[in-house]
Amino acid sequence: MMDVQTVRRGNAVQSLMSKLILPLVMAVAFALPARAALQIDITQGNVDPLPIAITDFVGEGSVGADMSAVISNNLERSGLFRPLPKASFIEKVSDINVQPRFGDWRVINSQALVTGQTRMEADGRLRVEFRLWDVLGEQQLTGLQFFTTPDNWRRVAHLISDAIYKRLTGEDGYFDTRIVYVSETGPKNARVKRLTIMDQDGHNPRMLTRGNELVLTPRFSPNSQEITYLAYRNNQPRVYVLDIETGQQEVVGEFPGMTFAPRFSPDGQRIIMSLQRGGNSDIYTMDLRSRQVVRLTNTAAIDTAPSYSPDGRQITFESDRGGSQQIYVMDASGSNQRRISFGQGSYATPVWSPRGDLIAFTKITGGRFVIGVMRPDGTGERVLTDGFHNEGPTWAPNGRVLMFFRETRGAQGGPSLWSVDVTGYNERPSPTPTFASDPAWSPRIQ
């Protein structure tokens, strides 16, 4: 975790450890005619990326250029921005408190401009400031100032990326987040699997388990500080909760028979999962305080892969009770169970969007695995991407982007992580140092 301070000009505001930044509006010291604010409409499907100039932040050493590179990479990968090459820049920014020469930026067709500076304070902290400018409107849109330790510069770059995304799209960014996944090493028939966590852009990977047991389906807690996952030791399934920072973990459930897909409830008080008892696989919840287990489904079918709606009132899951794998929705009490998928093929791994408006899924049809979305009532089904083997969608916290894993064919093939936005137009590989499967996207870091 990092201690970040955010400062309003003339009024310091120190955040507590593990708090996100507070908004900051920098004073604009010059009058401009009122114009419509620069905005990207991300609700209209495929959009032309906004040309944006992101200058190297002014300051000593390489940290300013490094931060600029992280911000450029974040925004470019979103598919909504087109960072312009620095070689095309006419104005060389040396003081961010001086109004830019907007004409120089219009010449290179930039519509937005990011400037910034870094400075080491006498107490050893790193101070970072940035400004976001509307080039055509010739006005400052936002600005923030941070104080942090020098080794946390990368997270500050993610926070700045989120601020830019928010100001220009009107929606929350997702760059100050992490991904937990199962890293896979070794030959295909004897893979060693370890839980690994990394920043959403692939940097700072860190192993969380040693690889001495099979690990599956890691999922974040709502505060992003814990992970629940399934591990097999001596062929016995156990459900764990792992503290990411301390590495401490506890067994919260050890169940006879098969266990699948543990996941936190939105309030973090329960874990929902599929347990096999009496030959049936049904959906159960466990209260993490009392350890009381409650059964929600009771059929002769296989019910698995449960996921709560963001308000905790409903649950989606997969079941073959109708003869093939399909997606169902029920109330959180287990009542009102109904099927919502009716397209061709089989459906699996449903997961509710953080916005509540969509359910993502894996669909197997015609020998191909597709990632798609539908509304919670089953209408509006859309395929986002397909291929030989795509599986395991997980949502970014703003509900605009999904990550999943894709298998490649052959003896040397293996799984890798990919992302795609809800339009299906912006699909990207997500870098990992090893083969990688079963990703889970964190909420915003607290």
Swiss-Prot record:
What this protein is called in its record is: Tol-Pal system protein TolB
Quaternary state and interactors: The Tol-Pal system is composed of five core proteins: the inner membrane proteins TolA, TolQ and TolR, the periplasmic protein TolB and the outer membrane protein Pal. They form a network linking the inner and outer membranes and the peptidoglycan layer.
Q: Where are the stretches annotated Disordered?
A: 424-446
The organism's taxonomic lineage, starting at the top: Bacteria, Pseudomonadati, Pseudomonadota, Alphaproteobacteria, Hyphomicrobiales
Q: What is the top-level taxon of the source organism?
A: Bacteria
Query: What GO terms fall under cellular component here?
Result: periplasmic space
Q: Which residues constitute the signal peptide according to the record?
A: 1-36
Main location, first listed in the record:
periplasm
Annotated source species: Parvibaculum lavamentivorans (strain DS-1 / DSM 13023 / NCIMB 13966)
Q: Enumerate the UniProt keywords alphabetically.
A: Cell cycle, Cell division, Periplasm, Signal
Provide the protein's localization.
Periplasm
The reply on keyword Cell division is yes
* Function as written in the Swiss-Prot or TrEMBL entry: Part of the Tol-Pal system, which plays a role in outer membrane invagination during cell division and is important for maintaining outer membrane integrity.
| Matching InterPro entries | 6-blade_b-propeller_TolB-like, PD40, Tol-Pal_TolB, TolB_N
The record ties this protein, via Pfam families, to: PD40, TolB_N
Q: Which GO terms describe its biological process?
A: cell division; protein import
Similarity comment: family membership: Belongs to the TolB family.
